[in-house]
């Protein structure tokens, strides 16, 4: 079954995973992301692991490229 054209890889992410993705794509360190979102570094790392798996990516660099190409970050 084909997916509709208007769906994106990031549509499968939770709101918090999406927030973490945007910070990671901008190169924000995990410690700073935790402070910004009021969550622990371990929780940030868990979100990172899950969102990379969901999006079938292996690195923050891939994430950054995706986010930039899809106008999710400036």
Place the predicted regions along the sequence by residue.
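N-terminal regulatory/sensing modules of transcriptional regulators
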Residues: 1-4
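Helix-turn-helix DNA-binding segment
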Residues: 6-41
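Noncatalytic linker/hinge segments flanking ATPase motor cores
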Residues: 12, 63-64
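Heptad-repeat coiled-coil/leucine-zipper interface motif in alpha-helices
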Residues: 16, 23, 47, 66-68
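Hydrophobic residues on short alpha-helical segments
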Residues: 21-25, 52, 64
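Recognition helix of helix-turn-helix DNA-binding domains
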Residues: 29-62
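…primarily DNA-binding HTH/wHTH and HhH modules…
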Residues: 73-74
């Amino acid at each position: 079954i084909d997916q509709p054209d208007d769906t994106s890889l990031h549509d499968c992410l939770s709101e918090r995973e999406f927030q973490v993705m945007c910070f990671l794509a901008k190169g924000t360190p995990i410690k700073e992301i935790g402070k910004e979102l009021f969550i622990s570094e371990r929780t940030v790392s868990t979100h990172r692991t899950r969102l990379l798996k969901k999006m079938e990516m292996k690195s923050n660099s891939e994430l950054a490229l995706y986010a930039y190409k899809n106008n999710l970050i400036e």
